[in-house]
Amino acid sequence: MAPPSAIAVEAVTDTSGVTLPDPLSASVKSNEIYGRRRKTDKSQWGVAAPSDSVNFRYHSHDHKPKAKRWDHHVSHEALIRKGNSLKQAAKYLGKPGLISLGGGLPSSEYFPFAELNLKVPTVGHFSESETKESGITITAGKHDLAQDKSIFDIATAFNYGQGSGSAQLLRWITEHTELVHNPPYSDWRCTMSIGSTSALDMALRMFTRPGDLILSEEYTFATAVETAAPMGLRVTGISMDEQGLLPDSMDHILATWDVKARGARKPHLLYTVPTGQNPTGATQSADRRREIYRVCQKHDLYILEDDPYYFLQMQPYTGPNSPDILPPSSHSEFLKSLVPSLLSIDVDGRVMRMDSFSKVLSPGSRIGWVTASEQIVHMYQMHADVSTQGPAGMAQLILWKLLDEHWGHVAYLDWLIHIRMEYTRRRDVIMQACEKYLPKEVVSWKPPMAGMFHWLRIEFRQHPDYPSKSIETIEEEIFMRVIEHGALVMRGSWFYANNEEEHDTLFFRATYAAAPAEKIEEGIRRLGEAVRAEFGLKGSNGATNG
């Protein structure tokens, strides 16, 4: 069948009159979700049981419009992929009385694991010390499903599964997505990934061909550029301000695109990290996201929304002597305080949102998920079935035990509020340290509103060896000088979207995620000491610079 004509996907360039659903007003309360779950039987939860996230949504979305189709943007590779025929046979395993001589699923009697015990926090006592003292132990047995003790067990989780992930955890993820984002079209779906880097790799294969250019922020996640390069893809950087990507700049680039001069067809894919952007820490406001979305509609761009820092949004930093920032008083207040995601304003189904547990639970779990239209999720699942095969069952069982069976949506929101406050405290520590120790005549910054990163601008033209030394050489010398002083920050040039373009600004990225608070302050002191030495500045680290 031929793909739809261009008329079939003509963009609506003004969404200002479109009423978008409020995730809170459109959903039930988080503590009522479990009561709205559909009844299921054991076959839904068995080994390699296929599932569709549409069956796990707790509201009807039939009143919403369907997503547009994206045949004209999808790669030839994605269009011809047929999926995994052996996995498709798993749908018959739930038939009562069936004796399977088909799939090579090892018998669980040969799994050398009988029980899994995990000590986890109780609600309101989330710290490491509190968990050690008052945490509870949750247990997963080998045959809990057969014994009606639980719907997920070792025998199921440790065997082969579907590329979409287990039905058990996928249900929880779908409910969470509906609660927080509530996409404004009817045929949205979720499917699991093994993290956003893998999801990006698969998305690029789905939407591009060698020689294409992708749009992104001018400074972007280095691994995204490195993922794209071996596929024959290049990245064009869009100018930024403190709110991230500038929609007018993107519009101008696309409106004046010259295929011959650029050596590539007009881009049709935007990769963006809208919240706590890596590396700059910039967060797009709600208005900025709507403006970006309208430009994407105007030029028919598909959007890859990579948003691992979404729940690490913070209140503004107001200075060292300001009153303590209080946590949100309710789940409703917390969710309303979050900037709406691009997914939540996506009336066309032109967003693939990539979520992850890496920044809020554990990066080693290698579990994330993708939300997009049914068409795109189906293609993603067929790819996963012949590549990643879905996240590790051990990790899925652990997270399901914690999130679904122990915490539920209510306690998970409590945990997210806790994490938000912890990162706010860390952000404030690094801000105060910068104010105390960094020479402001050559270093400047804006406090981040989300995420894990602090972006420091260095006035390299004030370096005593400029202009006899290049910006690249000065950056290298500062980098090595900081290491000599016992600290490590990342070079801003590592995050260029396009290394071939000339750059006239010098940045370094610091993180407040890893080191203890007292070490963060000491690290910034050493950074300030190194910068002073490199620029030949007088003054000691310990006095605030005016």
Which residues make up each language-model segment?
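Short, solvent-exposed loop/turn segments at secondary-structure junctions
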Residues: 104-108, 197, 220-222, 243, ...
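PLP-dependent enzyme catalytic core of the Aspartate aminotransferase-like
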Residues: 113, 485, 497-546
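Conserved core of the PLP fold type I
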Residues: 39, 125-300, 304, 310-345, ...
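Preference for well-ordered, secondary-structure-rich cores of eukaryotic proteins
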Residues: 105, 109-113, 225-238, 244-255, ...
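Conserved core segment of the aminotransferase class I/II
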Residues: 6-52, 64, 340-421
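Conserved glycine-rich beta-strand-loop-beta hairpin in the small C-terminal domain of fold type I
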Residues: 416-431, 442-461
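N-terminal "arm"/small-domain region of PLP-dependent enzymes with the aminotransferase-like
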Residues: 2-165, 175, 483-488
